[in-house]
Amino acid sequence: MSEVAFQDCYPDELSHCYGCGKNNTAGHQLKSYWQSDNQNSQGLTIAHYTPEACYTAIPGFVYGGLLASLIDCHGTGSAAAVAFQQANRAMGTLPPLRFVTAALNVSYIAPTPMGAELELIGTFIEVKEKKVVVEITVSANNVICAKGTVIAVKMPDSMLNVKC
């Protein structure tokens, strides 16, 4: 697994997301990585997250909206990482390659227990310059609890506040 999280390479001006922004101390601060040294579109991405009690749906189980948020942020982070790799650029170099969610589809497979560390695995389905499709599985205790598909598109210049 790589040592620097994808989200930690985002410019400070683009690091306020509630789900994964390093500058949002109230948020989840999800951290995504390459699962191995195979850092390409055939590689897998990974993240871990342990839900706090405030994300309880009913006693003992995680709120589904949290799972959707984690899938979303792991998908867009994975999209950014593969875009940098495809461009033969180091993650975090300017101009930024940030992706935003164009579509998110989540299926809840099994109840997600509280108290367990969640593991998110991202698999690339489609990789293009301005569009990346990532399939994400969320597991707890080695049981798949949710699956999601993120269609991530390159962030339009109108959303960028970074001067290169």
What do these predicted regions represent?
Residues 1-12, 110-164:
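HotDog/MaoC-like acyl-thioester-processing domains
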Residues 1-58:
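Non-catalytic linker/capping segments at the edges of enzyme domains
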Residues 27-29, 48, 101-105, 119-121, ...:
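Conserved beta-strand residues within beta-sheet cores
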Residues 39, 60, 109-111:
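Exposed regions on extracellular, virion, or secretory-pathway luminal proteins
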Residues 41-42, 46-82:
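A conserved, well-ordered hydrophobic junction motif at loop->secondary-structure transitions
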Residues 49-51, 108, 154:
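Hydrophobic residues in beta-strands and at strand termini
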Residues 77-119:
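Hydrophobic beta-strand-centered segment that forms part of the acyl-chain substrate-binding groove
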